[in-house]
């Protein structure tokens, strides 16, 4: 489910005074031969993140989300959840994720052909028109083992000259950079992070944060 092992990350930590996503990502790009030539980044920069902060114009047509079909297993699980967790938040009728490898591959194909080219431009955009926009929504599928990062990386390698560089680099950074790096940080520093208070925050959230009445739409 991950491209690097726990030992790989420990070896990385041995050679660094302080773990930083930027140098970890650079190391991974070279290791997996992604957008590099002679160990230098294609396009002259390791990250095009500054290019990936555009607002989403109303004129941009949003891609449709691929349909995930209900299976005999999801039917049974929905009934179980509705009975066992009837007082919990959420609604099983809104379940929209694929639950098989075949469907997950369809979602990957759809992302690569319909979304990836504009993923970078609108990576940080927020819109009331949709909550996914040009993102892949593959994270839960990767985390549950329905599709592997290896498969995704192999497909991305074939698109080197076919999509916008800022989009391709931006998505590669999510898969081999942030995902792998944060896993390594959690495995090696989780106790310190759990017990620590880096920003020395001492104020408590008001009850509105828990009841969904802050007046801030994304939170409520």
Provide a role label for each language-model segment.
Residues 1-97:
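Beta-rich, aromatic/charged-enriched effector core domains that present basic-aromatic interfaces
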Residues 54-220:
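Catalytic cores of enzymes that engage adenine nucleotides and/or redox cofactors via long glycine-rich
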